[in-house]
From Swiss-Prot:
This protein's name: Protein translocase subunit SecA
UniProt gene name: secA
GO molecular function annotation: ATP binding; metal ion binding; protein-exporting ATPase activity
Cofactor binding: number and manner: May bind 1 zinc ion per subunit.
InterPro entries: Helicase_ATP-bd, Helicase_C-like, P-loop_NTPase, SEC_C_motif, SecA, SecA_CS, SecA_DEAD, SecA_motor_DEAD
Length: 1113
């Protein structure tokens, strides 16, 4: 007995320990249920209201304290404000922690309430209760509720996912266990058909009682809409609001309302994209999401593991995005690819001839040629077929071992003859000297596609004896040349990758002249996703469809970091145990295996292994024919669109009726999968298309042996194979599963070791024979584990890079949210002024450069130095910073007070005379370079005597500078991430270099952003316009009446003013006291529709608004 087995016997295995922990809750639920089921329907609903109130009463003291602190913060100095806001943050965290305590306390009663609600719906056609306002609202849009006088009548049937359903489910004990596990913030692994969707109702209901919102996350929009409609009535019966974000357009009022519901359903991508959109919003009313409280992720493995390798990105056009070289260099690359194909085909022919010889030396030469052909074109079908012959693969692997020895010292002898080298495992392509020569054969410059040694060239330039101006010009030319060549090399590399590593109908499909990515895990099209770094454009060029313009990142986050923001995260799936380590490492999520309600009766058979793919597919077809004759339904799982179409053609030739589900045919997915359990039905599904929909069997089918699962290839992940098996044998139904494998399969080619190859040879494996061998099955599993480790490495690597971005993102998004909401904007602005003061002192005090300090101070803060030269040289940096900040703060306050003082008379006049007509007013404020039209609430601006204008101005400037700086920073971070990969050639860790360099980039970005913000704020004033002509007045009225956005303004309309404060103040006061009509005040905004950017410009030019007067908005 091993140590692990001994410990399991002593303490029980993990699963037993987990269930022991949950059992007391289940016992309490049963006790509570006995009392709850005796209540009337109205009393049952009343219990929910009592529980909701109990939660709010538990945290009312903390909420009152927060309200009190928010009132106190006004008028406090910077240090006191920071202290108060820190207390507010701490109290908000305490509220969440206290709520968890009270939720655990009321869990048995809440679970009993929802279980009994399910029972009442299952056992009664209608439930009659006293009508509330919510019931009346529900009756307007939902047919399962009707109002009869003061009574609300709930039906037990409704439409979900386009189908009429009759409620017939009541929670089992194992589902109560699952619900408790989910409430505790863990992952519940439940077998297919065990009712995961129903399990979720328990923790969703409980946590929704807090009013903080619960997010139920699904893998596709069909499931999110279906589940919200299917489970929604249970929640609505108790007065909870339910909505689904996928039913509404992004940034719409309807979507905002969906997030404000107690329970919100949606897809992982849309939740993530809404978060990014919120962090690009320019007004609080544009925000849709609330704080991230509690999320339950359905098919958690698919969302947190499979989708986690692709970050969510919102991108936009980049300058010169149309100037791309993919189509220009496509003929060069096609020429190289074609030459490689011919070479590798000839190498294979020569290798076969030599290896057939009796001479050992000839055989060795043949083995070398075979290995060379493999390095050049590993996916060549003839090569794959030849490698499955006895002794061939093991011979090639021995050759590989010999040339990889001594750190691949002799590998060049293999690869020099090739044009490029493909490494499938690393997903990389590398041009050889021979390939570069062929590429450049069409050009005059033999180094056309070769990057110059820029460091050596710049070093040589520094040593030249010439004047500084000439050296600078030469340096600029070297850098420009490097930039041009770098883009060429990158374009060619991406085109080569597109040809060598990406295959149509496997990783992507072409539909409607567009290249669409296929999710390798589910076989679904990934709408809106594009390969990054120019790879998508390269594939578009290869497929001769329109090459889309290059884009740049505006906002990005990985799903890992998005879901880690939730206060509490839980998930459910049928298959998570194999990835339990990763789920704990990254998300700190524990996996708990929930026992099945009935024992599993499915028969899982050993893999059947064939030599070639052709034999394997022939055997699959024979098996399908046999099973159909027995009257059993068959679900055939494939790994690509190509294979599903091949099997479909083979079945058509045999006259077998069947349905195909793949990325090209996904519209009727749920409908086809639901029908897949009927007698003699054959369904071919790419990977796990149709996941989330139950396959129900008739009594006749169960008698015949149940649903038969046939896997046509082992997937790279054992988890996906388990998902396919799990489609059969739900709720104790009979069924079977079997996988057909060939030595030509992708997994076997890449990861099957020499041991497998030699074992096959020893077993005397002949063509047409089938093997069912435990040793081989274990070898396949070991190969899968290898790939899983590899994929985990990729995801962890992605996360490590994104963690760097995440810490920066948190700083920027927090500052941005403070500006947007306005509550902490005053404190943030003062902090920014202080940071600029500190940076100025740090930059000049150490070098004792007082003159430089004075000049930079005027540029940054637009004030004279309050510090003399003697004080500058005699005091410590901290004291100097405080002195400078005091003066800067006073100057800033004076300027803001002056703006309020000048603006208020105009605001007051408009409010007094036209408050019934206008709701908002535009106030122009300039920094001397551009004019910002600041939109404010008219009443608020008058009541605060112009102070609210200052707050809106600060918000507008901070948001503008953050967005401009962050967008540019993301572009630089993208470039940095690409450039640091070369560090590995110098035996340095690219991630470490990335961390160091990105910190420096971020520090500089924040410093520049602070300076820009402060420079605008410290120069702010209300401009004094020249009296406009009547035509200009009318023209301006048309535009400005509708727009409160910031805009660039033609400064020729404004007088050139010196920075003489007294003259400036006088001019502004004169402008404020000028009689009405002498210079028209800024026109307020009416409550009417805005001009869309694509609408005709109101000036009458005939151009679109965005191309005319809206160009600079």
């Amino acid at each position: 007995m091993g140590f692990n087995e001994f410990m399991s016997k002593l303490f029980g295995n993990k699963s037993q320990r987990d269930l022991k922990e949950v059992k007391p809750f289940v016992d309490k639920i049963k006790v509570a249920y006995g009392e709850i089921e005796r209540l009337s329907d109205d009393d049952l609903r009343g219990r929910t209201a009592i529980l909701r109130q109990k939660i709010q009463d538990y945290v009312k003291d903390e909420r009152a304290e927060i309200d009190k602190l928010k009132v106190e913060v006004e008028g406090k100095d910077l240090d006191e404000r920071e202290e108060i806001w820190a207390k507010v943050d701490k109290l908000e965290k305490e509220i969440l922690d206290k709520m968890e305590v009270v939720l655990d306390e009321i869990l048995p009663e809440a679970f009993a309430i929802i279980k009994d609600t399910a029972r009442r719906f299952a056992q009664n056609e209608t439930i009659r209760v006293k009508a509330t306002d919510l019931d009346r609202d529900l009756a307007i849009n939902h047919d399962f509720v009707s109002i009869e006088g003061d009574t609300a009548v709930y039906q037990n049937h409704w439409v979900a996912g386009g189908n009429e359903i009759l409620w017939d489910m009541i929670h089992y004990d194992v589902q109560l266990i699952g619900g408790t596990v989910l409430h505790k913030g863990k992952i519940a692994e439940m077998a297919t058909g065990e009712g995961k969707t129903l399990v979720a109702t328990l923790p969703v209901f409980l946590n929704a009682l807090t009013g903080n919102g619960v997010h139920v996350v699904t893998v596709n929009d069909y499931l999110s809409k279906r589940d919200s409609e299917w489970m929604g009535p249970l929640y609505m019966f108790h007065g909870l609001t339910v909505d689904c974000i996928d039913k509404h357009q992004p940034n719409s009022d309807a979507r905002r309302k969906a997030y404000n519901a107690d329970i919100t359903f949606g897809t992982n991508n849309e939740f993530g994209f809404d978060y990014l959109r919120d962090n690009m919003a320019t007004s609080p009313k544009d925000l849709v999401q609330r704080k991230h409280n509690y999320a339950i992720v359905d098919e958690v493995d698919s969302v947190l593991i499979d989708d986690a390798r692709t970050p969510l990105i919102i991108s936009g056009p980049t300058p010169k995005g149309e100037d791309q070289l993919f189509e220009e260099f496509l003929p060069n690359v096609e020429k190289v690819v074609e030459a490689q194909r011919k070479l590798c085909s000839q190498l294979l022919i020569d290798a076969k001839n030599k290896m057939a010889s009796e001479d050992k030396k000839e055989q060795e030469e043949g083995s070398l040629l075979l290995y060379r052909s493999f390095k050049g074109l590993p996916k060549n079908k003839q090569l794959i077929k030849y490698l499955s012959e006895p002794g061939i693969k093991s011979s090639m692997l021995k050759t590989e071992e010999a040339y990889m020895a001594e750190n691949m010292r002799n590998m060049h002898l293999v690869t020099d003859e090739l044009y490029f080298i493909i490494d499938e495992k690393r997903n990389s392509v590398e041009l050889t000297e021979k390939g570069i020569d062929l590429l450049t054969s069409r050009t005059d410059d033999p180094k056309f596609f070769v990057l110059p040694d820029i460091a050596a060239e710049l070093s040589a330039l520094d040593n030249m004896e010439s004047d500084a101006e000439k050296r600078r010009e030469a340096k600029d030319e070297i850098i420009a040349n490097y930039s041009i060549k770098s883009e060429r090399v990158h374009t060619v590399n991406q085109l080569l990758k597109a040809y060598a590593l990406f295959e149509k109908d496997d990783q992507y499909v072409v539909m409607d002249n567009k290249v669409l990515i296929v999710d390798e895990q589910t076989g679904r099209i990934m709408d809106g996703r594009r390969y990054s770094d120019g790879l998508h454009q390269a594939i578009e060029a290869k497929e001769h469809v329109k090459v889309e313009a290059a884009t740049q990142t505006f906002a990005t986050i990985t799903l890992q970091n998005y879901f880690r923001m939730y206060h509490k995260l839980a998930g459910m799936t049928g298959t998570a145990e194999t990835e339990a380590g990763e789920l704990w490492d990254i998300y700190k999520l524990d996996v708990v295996v929930i026992p099945t309600n009935k024992p599993i009766a499915r028969k899982d058979m050993n893999d059947r292994i064939y030599k070639t793919a052709r034999e394997k597919y022939a055997a699959v077809i024979e098996e399908i024919v046999r099973l159909v004759e027995e009257g059993r339904p068959v679900l055939v799982g494939t790994t690509s669109v190509e294979i599903s179409e091949l099997l479909s053609r083979m079945l058509r030739l045999r006259g077998i009726q069947h349905n195909v589900l793949n990325a090209k045919l996904h519209q009727k997915e749920a409908e086809i999968v639901a029908q897949a359990g009927q007698k003699g039905t054959v369904t071919i599904a790419t990977n796990m298309a149709g996941r989330g929909t139950d396959i129900k069997l008739s009594a006749e089918v169960k008698k015949a042996g149940g649903l038969a699962i046939i896997g046509t290839e082992r997937h790279e992940s054992r988890r996906v194979d388990r998902q396919l098996r799990g489609r059969s044998g739900r709720q104790g139904d009979p069924g079977s599963s079997i996988f057909y494998v060939s030595l030509e399969d992708h997994l076997m080619r890449l990861f099957a070791t020499e041991k497998i190859a030699s074992l096959m040879d020893r077993l005397g494996f002949k063509e047409g024979e089938v093997l069912e061998n435990n040793m081989l099955s274990k070898s396949v599993e070991r190969a899968q584990k290898k790939v899983e480790e590899n994929n985990f490495g990729i995801r962890k690597h992605l996360l490590e890079y994104d963690d760097v971005m995440n810490s920066q993102r948190e700083v920027i998004y927090t500052r941005r949210r403070h500006a947007l909401m306005g509550e902490r904007i005053g404190m943030d602005v003062l902090n920014t002024i202080y940071d600029v003061c500190k940076a100025l002192i740090d930059n000049y005090a150490e070098a004792n450069d007082f003159e430089g300090f004075k000049e930079d101070l005027m540029r940054a803060l637009a004030i004279e130095s309050p510090i003399t030269q003697e004080i500058f040289r005699g005091k410590k940096a901290e004291e100097l910073t405080d002195m400078l900040f005091d003066e800067a703060y006073k100057s800033f306050q004076r300027k803001m007070d002056l703006i309020a003082e000048v603006a208020h008379p105009v605001v007051h006049q408009v409010f007094e005379t036209q408050a019934a007509v206008y709701e908002r007013i535009l106030i122009p404020i300039t920094d001397g370079k551009r004019v910002y039209n600041i939109g404010c609430n008219l009443r608020e601006a008058d009541e605060t005597r112009g102070k609210s204008i200052i707050k809106e101005f600060e918000k507008a400037i901070v948001l503008h500078t953050i967005d401009e700086s962050w967008k540019e920073h993301l572009r630089e971070m993208d470039e940095l991430r690409n450039s640091v990969q070369n560090a590995s050639y110098e035996n340095k860790d690219p991630l470490l270099i990335y961390k160091l360099e990105s910190y420096e980039l971020f520090r500089k970005m924040v410093e520049a952003m602070n300076r820009k913000t402060v420079a605008i704020l410290m120069r702010a004033r209300i401009p004094v316009p020249e009296a406009p002509s009547q035509e200009e007045l009318e023209h301006r009225r048309q535009i400005e009446i509708r727009h409160a956005a910031e805009q660039r303004t033609d400064m020729s309309k404004y007088r050139t003013q010196k920075d003489d404060i007294e003259a400036q103040q006088k001019a502004q006061r004169d402008a404020a006291s000028r009689p009405q009509g002498a210079a028209a005040p800024q026109t307020p905004i009416r409550n009417e529709n805005k001009i869309g950017r694509n609408d005709p410009c109101p000036c009458g030019s005939g151009k679109k608004f965005k191309q005319c007067h809206g160009r600079n908005l």
